[in-house]
């Protein structure tokens, strides 16, 4: 089996990948993550996940390279990572009582054969009605500044949800393991 490389510096994605009990290394790809004019959210995450995997293919020529990218979509608009408490508070105000769809792009590149599999896995979160004090307490407690949509589903963020829907809850954290297992099986990787 070729060695696995996770093209990400995300601790959340690393933690998810450890669940498969496969040895892997993690490396940070250096790519332009800008949104292109006219590009849909799905096209964006598919392109970026593939670009992340391809960016590491030269350094890892006999490996399976996993790339992933995620955006949140609210009322047709892409929500990025907030980076500041003020933007996180605003994103959660905007999401209050609404549904946000998270699109997670996933790519698995066999760098030896150059075969690439790419997918987009949607997952929808239906938010509770959130008052200002609850939003502020949450942002202060969890500091979700590096998370699209301004919450951490693996932590207190789940308290903000009324319900969720989708095929793979791990996609919400940023690495859809069910789809990844499908891709790894296609490459002949045995799990478990």
UniProtKB/Swiss-Prot annotation:
One of its GO terms (molecular function) is nucleoside triphosphate diphosphatase activity. One of its GO terms (cellular component) is cytoplasm. The record marks 12, 70, 154 as: Important for substrate specificity. It is found in: Cytoplasm. The active site is at 69 (proton acceptor). It catalyses: N(7)-methyl-GTP + H2O = N(7)-methyl-GMP + diphosphate + H(+). SUPFAM superfamilies: ITPase-like. Its cofactor is a divalent metal cation. Its EC number is 3.6.1.-. Keywords: Cytoplasm, Hydrolase, Nucleotide metabolism. It is an enzyme of class 3 (hydrolase). It comes from the Bacteria. GO terms for biological process: nucleotide metabolic process. Belongs to the Maf family. YceF subfamily. Nucleoside triphosphate pyrophosphatase that hydrolyzes 7-methyl-GTP (m(7)GTP). May have a dual role in cell division arrest and in preventing the incorporation of modified nucleotides into cellular nucleic acids. PANTHER family: 7-METHYL-GTP PYROPHOSPHATASE (PTHR43213:SF10), BIFUNCTIONAL DTTP/UTP PYROPHOSPHATASE/METHYLTRANSFERASE PROTEIN-RELATED (PTHR43213). This is 7-methyl-GTP pyrophosphatase.
């Amino acid at each position: 089996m070729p060695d696995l490389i996770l093209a990400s510096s995300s601790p959340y994605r690393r933690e998810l990948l450890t669940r498969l009990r496969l040895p892997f290394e993690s490396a940070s790809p250096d790519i332009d993550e800008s949104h292109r004019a006219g590009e849909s959210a799905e096209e964006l995450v598919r392109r970026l996940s593939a670009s992340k995997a391809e960016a590491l293919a030269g350094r890892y020529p006999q490996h399976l390279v996993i790339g992933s990218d995620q955006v949140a979509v609210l009322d047709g608009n892409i929500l990025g990572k907030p980076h500041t408490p003020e933007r996180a508070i605003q994103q959660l105000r905007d999401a209050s009582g609404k549904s946000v769809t998270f699109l997670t792009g996933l790519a698995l590149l066999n760098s030896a054969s150059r075969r690439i599999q790419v997918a987009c896995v949607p997952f929808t979160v239906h938010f509770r009605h959130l008052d200002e004090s609850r939003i502020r307490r949450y942002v202060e407690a969890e500091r979700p500044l590096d998370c699209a949509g301004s919450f951490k589903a693996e932590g207190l963020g789940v308290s903000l949800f009324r319900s969720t829907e989708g095929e793979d809850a791990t996609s919400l954290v940023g690495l859809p393991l069910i789809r990844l297992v499908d891709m790894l099986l296609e490459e002949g990787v045995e799990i478990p």
